[in-house]
Amino acid sequence: MAQIFNFSSGPAMLPAEVLKQAQQELRDWNGLGTSVMEVSHRGKEFIQVAEEAEKDFRDLLNVPSNYKVLFCHGGGRGQFAAVPLNILGDKTTADYVDAGYWAASAIKEAKKYCTPNVFDAKVTVDGLRAVKPMREWQLSDNAAYMHYCPNETIDGIAIDETPDFGKDVVVAADFSSTILSRPIDVSRYGVIYAGAQKNIGPAGLTIVIVREDLLGKANIACPSILDYSILNDNGSMFNTPPTFAWYLSGLVFKWLKANGGVAEMDKINQQKAELLYGVIDNSDFYRNDVAKANRSRMNVPFQLADSALDKLFLEESFAAGLHALKGHRVVGGMRASIYNAMPLEGVKALTDFMVEFERRHG
């Protein structure tokens, strides 16, 4: 079978070694003669999977002991509601920083539960899209928390600064597309959440890291399945969890640990991004309109100088084993998502194709 590199933004490419192990274990897991998808989530065998996954995840991100890790349903959009429902307490407003599509989506959902104080951080610098530095973010005095999205998959915009707003500011962040790609100081956040389908595992699982002093504040109308305290008290098993996604994510965590952990992923991700952006920047045929300080290392959107060639680019790249390069419908063009599971080899194959395509059509 020819090598395929999947540049999908999510569900995204998974490590080949993980898929191979899952394939080998699919019908006979742990010698039980059944699939992991068929065992009880409350049985000792799966409890071990769940406990190991949480431990490995904590190890990878150095999660402090005063933070709870929850394995949830609902995706990032579910957390757009869960955060205000759990963290507002008796307050009625929260600060929301708008830097792109997903931040705006979180704001739209939050309006159902509170009055967001929205700070538009988007700016244009020398004709390029950028984000105001955190020191310029205008936060209110009476907000229950501040929410932002460190990586915008559609816009290709990243906010790599570490929050430093003082101990009284509860920072909530949507890390769906950048979790585990670089070290983060978890202690600077009150809530971190991430849909699994980009850097963790299959779609259907969402991981929440929440500081324990924030538990117990849920709105009375908060659905039990979104209540952090209920999920924590029930070991993330208030109802039947997405067991296969949990199991496969656990395999990804072990793969990460075996391959140098988050620090090593950080180095490789930097190499991949530099290679791809280098080809774009050294060409008049391709362009990226994000300021270098805010370029995403996970999601690289780019446009061709002649959009009439877009269809041919996608057809030929697909035939070359470079899949899912079509840009999001909101922005068009191309987008290469190069999460942890994308090897440097895959990005090299893409850049080689781009250079050759430009030679023939530039």
UniProtKB/Swiss-Prot annotation:
Known EC number: 2.6.1.52
Residues annotated to bind pyridoxal 5'-phosphate: G76, R77, W102, T153, D174, Q197, N239, T240
Positions bearing N6-(pyridoxal phosphate)lysine: K198
Pfam families on file: Aminotran_5 (PF00266)
Cofactor note as given: Binds 1 pyridoxal phosphate per subunit.
Keywords, ordered alphabetically: Amino-acid biosynthesis, Aminotransferase, Cytoplasm, Pyridoxal phosphate, Pyridoxine biosynthesis, Serine biosynthesis, Transferase
Organism superkingdom: Bacteria
Class of this enzyme: transferase
Binding site for L-glutamate: S9, R42
Alphabetized GO MF terms: O-phospho-L-serine:2-oxoglutarate aminotransferase activity; pyridoxal phosphate binding
UniProt subcellular location: Cytoplasm
GO biological process: L-serine biosynthetic process; pyridoxine biosynthetic process
Catalytic function, reaction form: O-phospho-L-serine + 2-oxoglutarate = 3-phosphooxypyruvate + L-glutamate; 4-(phosphooxy)-L-threonine + 2-oxoglutarate = (R)-3-hydroxy-2-oxo-4-phosphooxybutanoate + L-glutamate
Coiled coil residues, start to end: none
Listed GO CC annotations: cytoplasm
Cofactor: pyridoxal 5'-phosphate
Pathway in which this enzyme or protein is active: Amino-acid biosynthesis; L-serine biosynthesis; L-serine from 3-phospho-D-glycerate: step 2/3; Cofactor biosynthesis; pyridoxine 5'-phosphate biosynthesis; pyridoxine 5'-phosphate from D-erythrose 4-phosphate: step 3/5
Keyword presence, Transferase: yes
Job of this protein: Catalyzes the reversible conversion of 3-phosphohydroxypyruvate to phosphoserine and of 3-hydroxy-2-oxo-4-phosphonooxybutanoate to phosphohydroxythreonine.
Entry similarity comment: Belongs to the class-V pyridoxal-phosphate-dependent aminotransferase family. SerC subfamily.
Record's subunit section: Homodimer.
Matches recorded under NCBIfam families: PRK05355.1, serC_1
Designated name of the protein: Phosphoserine aminotransferase
Organism: Escherichia coli (strain 55989 / EAEC)
Lineage: Bacteria, Pseudomonadati, Pseudomonadota, Gammaproteobacteria, Enterobacterales
